[in-house]
Amino acid sequence: MTGRATFYYDFNSPYSYLAAERISSLFAEAEIEQPEWQPISFGHLLQTTGRRPWSLPPEGPDPDHLAEIQRRADDRGLPKVVYPEGWPIENYSLNPVRAAVYAKESGRVVSFSLACFRQVFAAGRDMSDVDNVLVAAAACELHPNAVLKGIETKSVKDKLRAATDEALSRGIEGIPTLAVGDELFWGDDKLEEAVAALRRE
């Protein structure tokens, strides 16, 4: 048995947004246990692996990827994808993923993460502005003051670093990735394959 799947993501990734919007329903339809949602630091992942994603200048953002993201959003009835000013570098912050770690401790990681993704890619809000993180927190009934304190705690910072290091140790190089035992399914378009692997168990 592979056990429960783990969904790795960060809020700066539009493909993670697309995956987050449908992963729960895919698992529910397949009648398999919902995955663990695990926020990680994409920035640390890239620094460690040396990978250069499609979204980074000077070559990126790649217009083909942007068009594909919008096509998928349209096909799934999602709002027009809006990128915050300064995306993907200038607005990158650890505060949203730290807040997600805090939300996980409170049992609200899924609702917070969806609220945060929608702030970024449906509303185009800059999540390096902590006030926008707190809007997402309030949307899932997390007290903004508690979140503000939580993201500064050593415990939350250590858990985020440990989760990112674990992702690296599993061979994860990009997000979103769904880990099913030793198998890694990298990309929004790989979710169905991951579900099929779980159903074979």
Language-model features and meaning:
Residues 15-120:
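Structural alpha/beta surface segment adjacent to cysteine/selenocysteine redox centers
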Residues 3-6, 11-33, 37, 115-201:
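C-terminal cap of thioredoxin/glutaredoxin-like
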